[in-house]
Amino acid sequence: MGQKVHPYGFRLGYNKNWLSRWFSKKDYPEFVFEDNKIRKFVKKSLYHAGISKIEIERAGGKIRLIIHTARPGIVIGRKGTEIEKVRGDLKQRFSREFTVEVNEIRRPEIDAQLVAENIALQLERRVAFRRAMKRTVGLSRKFGAEGIKVSCAGRLAGAEIARSEWYRDGRVPLQTLRADIDYGYAIAKTTYGVIGVKVWIFKGEILDHEVEA
């Protein structure tokens, strides 16, 4: 059975950048574990903010977070109250100095992580999986995606035996390095068990292949 490499890891250093940017020898395992805990904490604290990814940079004892979100107003809050609360909670929990920046995602319909989370939410609300997949694919294509592939795996429609189904529209060239492929994964917790949702979105080709900031 053919195995698929992660589209992001496949392009690291070519036209994609690392989500954690720091260097350490003896503290490496601790920092990796801490980065994971920071991301989980921020996503949980700002669950309704539509957070796609969180970039982490470390310099000395200070940590810089760059939050990519579809709803910056929810992250920042009125007069910056929400973002200050999150920063204070992070400082108290991890005993480090944090600076937090917010980047707005202007077209969440073609952000793979947000699309995957949206499909997972629909499945949890008992929307038929084929309808959720087709509706999402159509919306992403309408907003400028050159191609999209969606895969759902688990006890689909409450079936006794778990299976996977996928739906694709347009081109999704996973093995082409210059292709700008966005990838997202989410889990839908249904009454029948968990359903894994994977989304690949092809946004066009990057010809100069410079690493994105």
Swiss-Prot record:
Output the PROSITE patterns linked to this UniProt entry: KH_TYPE_2 (PS50823), RIBOSOMAL_S3 (PS00548)
Which Pfam families does this entry report, sorted A to Z?
KH_2 (PF07650), Ribosomal_S3_C (PF00189)
Q: Which SMART domains match?
A: KH
Q: Tell me where the transmembrane regions lie.
A: none
Residues annotated as signal peptide: none
Q: Which GO terms describe its cellular component?
A: cytosolic small ribosomal subunit
Q: Which GO terms describe its biological process?
A: translation
Which Gene3D superfamilies does the annotation name?
3.30.300.20, Ribosomal protein S3, C-terminal domain
Q: Which GO terms describe its molecular function?
A: mRNA binding; rRNA binding; structural constituent of ribosome
Matching HAMAP family: Ribosomal_uS3_B
What does this protein's UniProt record list under function? Binds the lower part of the 30S subunit head. Binds mRNA in the 70S ribosome, positioning it for translation.
| Family in the record | Belongs to the universal ribosomal protein uS3 family.
- Name of this protein: Small ribosomal subunit protein uS3
Gene source species: Solidesulfovibrio magneticus (strain ATCC 700980 / DSM 13731 / RS-1)
Please spell out the taxonomic lineage of the organism that makes this protein: Bacteria, Pseudomonadati, Thermodesulfobacteriota, Desulfovibrionia, Desulfovibrionales
The gene from which this protein is expressed is: rpsC
